[in-house]
Amino acid sequence: MWRYISKHAYSRKFRNSHDSALLGFSQYSSSFGKTRPLQCLCEESTTHPNLGLSQNSIFSRISRKVRHLEGICEESSKNPHLGLSQNSTFSSVKGDFRICGKRGSGSLGRLRSYGSAAEAIVSTSEEDIDEIQELIEEMDKENEALKANLQPKQPKTIGGMGVGKYNFLRRRQIKVETEAWEEAAKEYQELLMDMCEQKLAPNLPYMKSLFLGWFEPLRDAIAAEQKLCDEGKNRGAYAPFFDQLPAEMMAVITMHKLMGLLMTGGGTGSARVVQAASYIGEAIEHEARIHRFLEKTKKSNALSGDLEETPGDMMKERERLRKKVKILMKKQKLRQVRKIVKQQDDEKPWGQDNLVKVGCRLIQILMETAYIQPPNDQLDDGPPDIRPAFVHTLKTVETMKGSRRYGVIQCDPLVRKGLDKTARHMVIPYMPMLVPPQSWLGYDKGGYLFLPSYIMRTHGAKQQREAVKRVPKKQLEPVFQALDTLGNTKWRVNRKVLGIVDRIWASGGRLADLVDREDVPLPEAPDTEDEAEIRKWKWKVKGVKKENCERHSQRCDIELKLAVARKMKDEDGFYYPHNLDFRGRAYPMHPYLNHLGSDLCRGILEFAEGRPLGTSGLRWLKIHLANVYGGGVDKLSYEGRVAFSENHLEDIFDSAERPLEGKRWWLGAEDPFQCLATCINIAEALRSPSPETAISYMPIHQDGSCNGLQHYAALGRDKLGAAAVNLVAGDKPADVYSGIAARVLDIMKRDAAKDPANDPNVMRARLLINQVDRKLVKQTVMTSVYGVTYIGARDQIKKRLKERGVIEDDNELFAAACYAAKTTLTALGEMFEAARSIMSWLGDCAKIIAMENHPVRWTTPLGLPVVQPYRKLGRHLIKTSLQILTLQRETDKVMVKRQRTAFPPNFVHSLDGSHMMMTAIACKESGLSFAGVHDSYWTHACDVDQMNKILREKFVELYDAPILENLLESFQQSFPDLQFPPLPERGDFDLREVLESPYFFN
């Protein structure tokens, strides 16, 4: 044992001669490893103070201990009864420490053997040996620290950028999050001062001038209301919350939030009072919290003038106060406790009732102060037509259960007309971030620096929120890691594509799926008293108005996206913090311009960090072009897609160099703006001297083949289903939509051959035979896996048939859609029998649980707890200054039917979310940039092959686990008294075939 201790103490970690050289250790050979004796190092430290070894260092302490042992050794030579021989370990230690007494002599001497240590060491010296062992272990640690200090220091970077640049951008980000409303208010006040000084209105766009005209009277009225609240003359329930922000900020928030709601309200120019009041109230509360924190920070940082604190500091302060309160309570100092609690009262959430009361009062003040009149060129010779910009009305809506009335805020037609030009003047919250988001550490810890950020969008579902809060942090680490990976992907605006979008939009839209910027003219009233003609005219007017509402809504949406793109186009890069829906699917927190959006968004966005294409990257660019061009080309083999792109090189160059002046080939694509971006990228690469070394910023997509059915096929080990959705290798991708369309056509052909006298569907089958194609059934197939009902399928197919205009009679159109929907669902059941049985089993389990008045709960493979939020809603009346509002609140009763029907799709969504997050983590570990859109995974062209390998491996890893068995076991543990049906039978499909399937994601 002692031989081991002695040898271990002297050889441990000193064998790494290369590492030791950093500390001045020389190399020589010995049976104990390679080390320059310790005493030399101690002496050397006195001549080289930079080594940082003080008199009290480990080396000095070991040296002193050895000297102590020397004394024992010398004593033993005089007194042989101690039993310490000349060859003992102590002698060896002594020799080892004296070896380099004369530095530079070159003579290292001879180390003594430890062979007799076991016999030589007496038990009374064990403590000394142990102490040396401990000291040497401490010295090892000091070595490591010292070695790290002596390493050449790498330049520090944060988020891939220098510290100076990061700090500059971080300050800008803090300003964006905390001062947006303040800056907007300041801008209005400066414009008002300019008007007063110059005695004329500034040359502003129409909507900006409207905002400016409303701002001053609204601000003054809010200030007057705040004064009444301060003086105690206002006894409204909202009074305690009404003075927590400056009046000018409340005015700007009220105007912008209401206008934002009107812009996204479906083009009707109206918003429900309860929604508007909640929206405005929440914004006021959030801003009040930030304002309060900043005011405290300004006081504490008055000398430095810096703003470096974040909500993390708030959490630390709260923790400090919590501990202080506990100590005071133990000491029975209740008066001091009450004082602290009173100071912290304003930190409490306001509650839904108070939010809507504050929001209603602000809307009411806006209605009382905001007026509008037509522009000068529209005025007649009469008196000016000044009228309220907003009015409060009641709207009646017919439902299946009867009619309901609710309050709405309706804007004047002149305001509505200008709404789609408003986005550029709006304060848009939750903009993309200039620095990487804060890492997720908990339910409300992560994401934006100051703006309220929650890891899950629970929409008021208390049980789901509590489930996430209760789960151990370690269990959620993979989820945190995946969200951080998605949030740390750096993006930028593709300025070339944005320039083309701006040109098309400025010239009226109508190209590349951009909506027409003009409304459809209303049909003129017929000059007749024929009631049938008048009815037809009214029907047409209704249709045109609906079309114009849809156009208006689309215009507002495009304006919001472009407003963000224009604000971000000059940035080197930006980031999208992500969070989850309750099923565990990840979404960017910014709502407008993000990669989950339309073709317009995806065409405008690209990675901020480029990578050389390489040979495989150029090939994947060509495949990607075929994918976004679509029209069936995306269903060819990879070789066929590459050939398509190579056959269209002339069109690609023309599109890239003269997108609007040339042949406009790119406009024929299904995703035109993504096609244009790809054309530009390919043209740049092929025009460069070395295409393989050209830098590409384009995200290349790999999409699942009807991904929901892929998950069901894996769950059920279903061979037939697996082959239909590319879990099995093939020469070209299997197209499940074409497969279902072929089955539907077979059924209809059989029906068409029957006698129409006996079956009314015969004529419908004959009518529809020429209409059956993959496009007719695609949406129904896609959504069937997520629980589409017969009614949903009927409406989807009816919409497709109506677009084709083959059946003009509405009644016949409806009947044909009914027949086609039934036929499509029959074909689906035949092809995906295993999926249907699993869906039924999931639904049955959910029903059993819900019948006991419990929501369905499960834990995803990544450890995320999920609680289905479907509960019956109770109504709660609340009196506000504007009207009596009905607020909806969850009751204790679950919705049995909804719990049952929603469980299969929600469960599969939680699995596809897990697969995406597992892939994201693995890609990050492999050094790949990664972005994910549910079942579409993106990376640089040069890295697609590696990402493809990873995503297949992660899919197999996911389904190697007994997912359904684990689910059933969790149900049985949670509800031991309930009887659940046995698991459905599964097939013998070998999951590892996925690893060899080139078109699994393609």
UniProtKB/Swiss-Prot annotation:
Disulfide bridge positions per record: none
Subcellular location, record wording: Mitochondrion
PANTHER family in the cross-refs: DNA-DIRECTED RNA POLYMERASE 1B, MITOCHONDRIAL (PTHR10102:SF27), DNA-DIRECTED RNA POLYMERASE, MITOCHONDRIAL (PTHR10102)
Name recorded for this polypeptide: DNA-directed RNA polymerase 1B, mitochondrial
First and last residues of the transit peptide: 1-21
PROSITE patterns, alphabetized: RNA_POL_PHAGE_1 (PS00900), RNA_POL_PHAGE_2 (PS00489)
InterPro entries named in the record: DNA-dir_RNA_pol_helix_hairp_sf, DNA-dir_Rpol_C_phage-type, DNA-dir_Rpol_phage-type, DNA/RNA_pol_sf, RNA_POL_N_sf, RPOL_N
Active site: 703, 778, 935
Keyword terms, alphabetized: DNA-directed RNA polymerase, Mitochondrion, Nucleotidyltransferase, Transcription, Transferase, Transit peptide
A GO molecular function held by the record: DNA binding
GO cellular component, one term: mitochondrial DNA-directed RNA polymerase complex
Keyword Nucleotidyltransferase: yes
Function: DNA-dependent RNA polymerase catalyzes the transcription of DNA into RNA using the four ribonucleoside triphosphates as substrates.
GO biological process, one term: mitochondrial transcription
Taxonomic source organism: Nicotiana tabacum (Common tobacco)
tRNA-binding listed as a keyword: no
Chain's gene name: RPOT1-TOM
Catalytic activity: RNA(n) + a ribonucleoside 5'-triphosphate = RNA(n+1) + diphosphate
Enzyme type, top EC level: transferase
Family statement drawn from the similarity comment of this UniProt entry: Belongs to the phage and mitochondrial RNA polymerase family.
Chief localisation class: mitochondrion
A Pfam short name: RNA_pol
Classification of source organism: Eukaryota, Viridiplantae, Streptophyta, Embryophyta, Tracheophyta
Superkingdom to which the source organism belongs: Eukaryota
Enzyme Commission number: 2.7.7.6
